[in-house]
């Protein structure tokens, strides 16, 4: 699905992609909010979580576990969303169900450490967008 390009109001790429996809689906320009992953979705009427290049799955403070496997298990046991959208750099949105998104994370995610300013905990971070990633999304 092609995402509408709108005037950028956020310097954060992820917030901009979320706003653009929400506009594409609803016709509304919405303010980005920090919705807890286990309570609601980025685009609630579609039960959809929106991600983009280099995203963090969830902050270390709210995603429990000390290993990649523990964090994946915790996230997918508690996540509210049932649809996951990856907005590519060319503004194509790739939609995934929960099982496909988990495979995506297992393929392109890695355990990383938050900055000391944010507590220094472990988090899952997705790699920056690559041709291999786009090919995977097209085949999924």
Q: What is each PLM-predicted segment?
A:
Residues 1-140:
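Nucleic-acid endonuclease domains
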